[in-house]
Amino acid sequence: PVRLAQSAAQNYGITVIPGAEITREPVSIGHFNALFTTDNNLIYDRDPLQALRNAKAQGAIIMHNHPGWRRTSVESPETEQKAYDEGLIGGVETMNGSEFYPKIIDRARERGLFVAANTDIHDSATETYRAQGQLRNMTLILAADNSIEAVREALENRRTLAWSFGTLAGEEQMLKDFFKACVSVREIVSDGKYTTYAVTNNSSLEFMLQGSGTPFRFRPFTSFTAKVRKGESLKWTLLNCWCGENSHPVVEM
């Protein structure tokens, strides 16, 4: 099936990554995706830890799915903790469907994991997202191209950001760099004491900014003007970008 999908996907510019889900009881054990597998028939074992080891042995990158689903906290139960401690986990979902786990951003940073936002969709995207006026969740993979090799390299080096319902999550510097890649600043006028800039959002994503005053929405493909003392930089806290359980990046331009 994977080879058939990969052949058809070439006509649409889609990259199909072979994989398998390793699923057990969600509260006491958890759900995991094994990416870049070579033979799914060799993965299964009654022991979920051994199944994860089998996937890892064939070169798979394992992602921990929805770590807070059906749980009262995101703290890891025993089996899950063992999987982390053995180095079996390479990435983790900070968002799944409409769920967001800010505390998991800290885990990803501390353990060197890529972050992901996925739909876990069981219906059509139109019914679940577009009919509600929303875009589906996205994992932004900062890869050289969309080949399997480039995608894998980006995941291994944690070059991902997670996006869901207008919220971005990931590593602090990457969020800052992403914002600066989306936004341009142009000087309009300077009177020797103050400088006025035009600030443009060149992306299709919205940012929630807070400077020295009230937070405001910086909508896609719009501009605003900002005035600062000559020699000072523009500075905002990105309130819809999360780099930790209780932290947001601050950018200067």
What is the predicted role of each segment?
Residues V2-L88:
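Extended substrate/RNA-proximal surfaces in nucleic-acid metabolism proteins
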Residues P26-T38, R71-M253:
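Charged catalytic cores and adjacent phosphate/nucleic-acid-binding surfaces used
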